[in-house]
Curated annotation (Swiss-Prot):
It comes from Gallus gallus. One of its GO terms (molecular function) is cytokine activity. This is Interferon lambda-3. Residues 1-21 form the signal peptide. Cytokine which plays a critical role in the antiviral host defense, predominantly in the epithelial tissues. Acts as a ligand for the heterodimeric class II cytokine receptor composed of IL10RB and IFNLR1, and receptor engagement leads to the activation of the JAK/STAT signaling pathway resulting in the expression of IFN-stimulated genes (ISG), which mediate the antiviral state. The lineage of its organism: Eukaryota, Metazoa, Chordata, Craniata, Vertebrata. Keywords: Antiviral defense, Cytokine, Disulfide bond, Secreted, Signal. It comes from the Eukaryota. Its main location: secreted. InterPro entries: IFN-lambda_sf, INF_lambda. One of its GO terms (biological process) is innate immune response.
């Protein structure tokens, strides 16, 4: 009887030691951006309201901006899938920064829902890049655009960056749609 009890304890102890000796295979987190091919109408409506309100605010201000960040000589469909994701993540980084620090209180109230949505998108994009292309190096086209963005962030006023990001928000969402379509984006 004592021998049987010791055997059970011994088997239990050895079993737990053996299980701990081998690394556990954790299931890979999947990268699914397909939900962003067609964002929820509620999210799009909130973004549309924010953009319209910003346009109304712009009419009342005297901003003179020449920022042409979102004017590119190439189309996003020309980029590889990791480049597309990197591009949209960078566009969202600027947009989220702008929406986090709006220049008017009126805009601050309207941008909360779009900000939450875009922040979630950015997290999903970063997860995908970390999972699928952790050591990805951007192509020459994208590298040039990223450098242009970095320079603009340093040289442009907050108001001009805000105008550029918000007025081109639907271009960012179209770029997101292309990134979500992966190889099917043409």
């Amino acid at each position: 009887m004592v021998c049987y009890g010791v055997t059970i304890i011994l088997v239990g102890t050895l079993g737990s030691l053996l299980v701990g000796a081998f690394p556990q295979v954790t299931p890979k987190k999947s990268c699914s951006l397909s939900k962003y091919q067609f964002p929820a109408p509620l999210e799009l409506k909130a973004v549309w309201r924010m953009k319209e309100q910003f346009e109304d605010i712009m009419l009342l201000t005297n901003r003179k901006c020449n920022t042409r960040l979102f004017h590119r000589k190439w189309d996003i469909a020309e980029l590889s899938v990791p480049d597309r994701i990197t591009l949209v993540e960078a566009e969202l980084d600027l947009t989220i920064t702008v929406l986090t620090n709006p220049t008017t209180q009126r805009l601050a109230e309207t941008c909360q829902q779009p900000l939450a949505f875009l922040t979630q998108v950015q997290e999903d994009l970063r997860d995908c890049l970390a999972l699928e292309a952790p050591s990805h190096q951007p192509s020459g086209k994208l590298r040039h655009w990223l450098q242009k963005l970095k320079t603009a962030k340093k040289k442009e006023t907050a108001g001009c960056l805000e105008a550029s990001a918000i007025l081109h928000i639907f271009q960012v969402l179209n770029d997101l749609r292309c990134a979500a379509q992966r190889e099917d984006c043409t």
